[in-house]
C-alpha cells in the first residue's frame, strides 16, 4: 500500500549505515505500527543446533587454542561492531570477516600448506539484533571451509541459523571436520 512509501526515506538513510541499521529501522517502523517483532527461531527451532559436537571428529588441544584465540579476537572487535567471523590457524588470526562476508574471508584463508587445520568461529556481532539477524551456516560454508583447509566450525549456542543440518554433519564426517556449538561457560 501507499503507506510504505512514507517509510522509504528512513530506510534509505539507514542503508548508509549497513544492513543491521536497515533491520533496526524496519523493526522501529513495525513497532510504531504496533507490530511486534519475534525471534525467527521461535518459529523454526529446527534451524539451531544445541550445545555440543555434531560430528565424529572433536576439537583437539590445538583446535581449542585456535578457538579461544578466535573468540578473544571477536570480543576485541566487538567494540567496533565490525565482524561476526574469524579464521584462526596455529593460534594466529588468518582472516577476519568484513564487507565481503564469510565466503570472501574463507577464500582469503585458503592454505596450500595446511589441510584440515584451523577453525572458523562465527558469532553474532555485539549490537546485532538476534531476533532477525543471526549468523548463518550451511553446506556451502562447510565446503568453503574445507577448501580453505580448515578443520572445524564453531557457532554460539542459540545464536545462529544452521541450514541443511544432516547434509552438513555428513559432509563434516566424510571430510574429518568438526561442527561444534559452544556455550557461555566455554567462552570465559
Feature map (PLM): residue ranges:
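Short Gly/Thr/Asp-enriched flexible loops that form oxyanion-binding sites at enzyme active sites
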Residues: 1-4, 27, 164-169
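Charged, glycine-enriched surface loops/patches
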Residues: 10
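Conserved mixed alpha/beta catalytic, RNA-binding, or beta-rich assembly cores of soluble enzyme
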Residues: 1-7, 16-20, 31-146, 155, ...
Amino acid at each position: 500500500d501507499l503507506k510504505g512509501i512514507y517509510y522509504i526515506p528512513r530506510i534509505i538513510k539507514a542503508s548508509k549505515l549497513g544492513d543491521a541499521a536497515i533491520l533496526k529501522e524496519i523493526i522501529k517502523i513495525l513497532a510504531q505500527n504496533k507490530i511486534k517483532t519475534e525471534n525467527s527461531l521461535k518459529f523454526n527451532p529446527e534451524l539451531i543446533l544445541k550445545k555440543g559436537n555434531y560430528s565424529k571428529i572433536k576439537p583437539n588441544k590445538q583446535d581449542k587454542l585456535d578457538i579461544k584465540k578466535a573468540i578473544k579476537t571477536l570480543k576485541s572487535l566487538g567494540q567496533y561492531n565490525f565482524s561476526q567471523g574469524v579464521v584462526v590457524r596455529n593460534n594466529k588470526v588468518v582472516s577476519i570477516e568484513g564487507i565481503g562476508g564469510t565466503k570472501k574471508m574463507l577464500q582469503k584463508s585458503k592454505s596450500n600448506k595446511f589441510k584440515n587445520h584451523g577453525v572458523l568461529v562465527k558469532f553474532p556481532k555485539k549490537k546485532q539484533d538476534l531476533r532477525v539477524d543471526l549468523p548463518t551456516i550451511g553446506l556451502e560454508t562447510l565446503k568453503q571451509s574445507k577448501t580453505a583447509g580448515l578443520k572445524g566450525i564453531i557457532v554460539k549456542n542459540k545464536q545462529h541459523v544452521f541450514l541443511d543440518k544432516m547434509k552438513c554433519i555428513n559432509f563434516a564426517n566424510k571430510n574429518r571436520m568438526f561442527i561444534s556449538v559452544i556455550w557461555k561457560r566455554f567462552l570465559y
